[in-house]
Amino acid sequence: MALALTEMGSRLEQRSRMALEEDTREQISFCSAHTDNYEDPMLVISESRLRDNARRFKAAMPRVRPHFAVKANPHGDVLRIFKEEGLCFEVASIAEIDAMIKLDVNIETVFYSNPIKSPASVRRATEAGI
């Protein structure tokens, strides 16, 4: 039975990798067709990939409440998508605290875990209810 489950898991992982590779190829093709006038580097973010990754993470660990580190990508749309997918957030600066307020997240679920906190940032976090 264990071997059958391992083989099934391997096939699912292989299909998942193939779908991911196809999605990546489509994104590269799309970007290539739309970036002829750009010379500077750019970051392209897939909303569907963000949503899928958030859902997969939550499904894999249903008892865990994931907290996205805002410093990893503070773009408002990324934060909005993760909020809509039910993720919580971890902040490390006044700007990130303010982003949470602007996004109207449940402040009680926000972690403020910067190991080096200025008095001003501690005051701001306290004022925000973190």
Where are these regions (language model features)?
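A charged N-terminal "starter" segment
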Residues: 1-130
